[in-house]
């Protein structure tokens, strides 16, 4: 296995878990709307995020906001004066700076173990804690540096994709070996191990990028304005065909 294989597989799994998870979340949202119930969005184009913190504001919003409100904020001694629907919109009026880092790593460690009681999930949680901590320090030391959103997105996506390795790997050794390949220059000299299916893999990656990034309009707006009228027309034609057959 080469570094190219690791990158390819991490991107493919990152797209797979996003499409799988967000798909049945949207199925639940759509089913609820048929019954006149509106649930908050659980995914908001996470791979369009411009930094790690922004990613977790967009990914599995119900869980990440719950962890933030009921675990992270209490751990850092934050006082919250209001909560909006879904745990979003907290107003923090006081917090202890010294507790932020401890709360960050502890809450992410717990979040990792919540996904599964093994070392790989703990590593997954601590990886994201370290990434968020590193980004926080970067912002503190480069407040005057302005980065274009597209460039920031291009820098954020590979960092988040590498975080899926411990989530999917079979063991800690497997995780460490794959990460080691990423930082080993010689491993980039090897060819892609998936070269027999290179065209298919390339097509899947391109489709994944286009499907994962932000649309100009929110998904439900597209469905309502463009797909819904077509669906209604098809429904009328289908009913007319039934009448003719009867």
Task: Give names to the regions the model predicted.
Residues 1-209, 217-246:
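Membrane-embedded transmembrane alpha-helical bundles that form the catalytic cores
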